[in-house]
């Protein structure tokens, strides 16, 4: 059986852990993952930001690594992919304004393909209008957008994840273990030791 192929949408100032960890973990279990960014080509990089929880009123932000894209956004055909991954950080703030991004996201939702969104990545789902009747979580500041988009907000600790059908969401990177476990389950992946 051919490896499942996943599409990861990223942009400058995507959260460092939220792109690096899932990208590497999904490759580790044998999936093909194409990381793309509007306006950039394979081999180019996006800047990442490290968001941390240090006791302030919101997360802190520090420069992260450069993340190298391994595919080109232009001409991306969503029909060639089995699932979609939407990391958080600052990138979703502007990616959600790109109609080509929204078209891709709508394809995954309309075809009932698995979607994993983390933190602010859910902002892209709200802009695409695909949360009507769905329950999800995200970074708490995204809750009003989820509700306005017709979604049911699920409040949970930052290290937990939520699954509604084939939609897997989590508040932030501390949820990686549970978020990835749930996403892999939705993808039909079983890991045995």
Indicate where each model-derived feature is located.
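Extended, subdomain-level signal for the structured scaffold at the beginning of enzyme domains
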Residues: 1-111, 123-135, 143-193
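Short, thiol/selenol-centered motifs that function as redox-active sites or metal-ligating centers
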Residues: 118-121
């Amino acid at each position: 059986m051919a490896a499942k192929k996943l599409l990861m949408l990223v942009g400058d100032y995507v959260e460092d852990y939220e792109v690096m960890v899932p990208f590497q973990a999904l490759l580790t279990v044998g999936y093909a993952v194409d990381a793309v960014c509007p306006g950039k080509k394979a081999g180019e990089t996006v800047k990442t930001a490290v968001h941390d929880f240090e006791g302030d009123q919101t997360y802190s932000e520090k420069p992260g690594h450069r993340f190298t894209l391994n595919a080109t956004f232009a001409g991306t055909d969503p029909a060639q992919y089995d699932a979609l991954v939407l990391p958080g950080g600052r990138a979703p703030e502007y990616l959600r304004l790109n109609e080509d991004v929204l078209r891709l996201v709508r394809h995954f939702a309309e075809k009932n393909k698995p979607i994993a969104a983390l933190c602010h990545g859910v902002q892209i789902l709200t802009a695409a209008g695909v949360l009507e009747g769905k329950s999800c979580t995200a970074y708490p500041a995204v809750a009003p957008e989820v509700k306005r988009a017709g979604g049911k907000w699920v409040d949970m600790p930052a290290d937990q994840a939520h699954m509604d059908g084939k939609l897997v969401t989590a508040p932030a990177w501390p949820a990686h273990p549970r978020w990835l476990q749930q996403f892999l389950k939705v993808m039909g992946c079983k890991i045995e030791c």
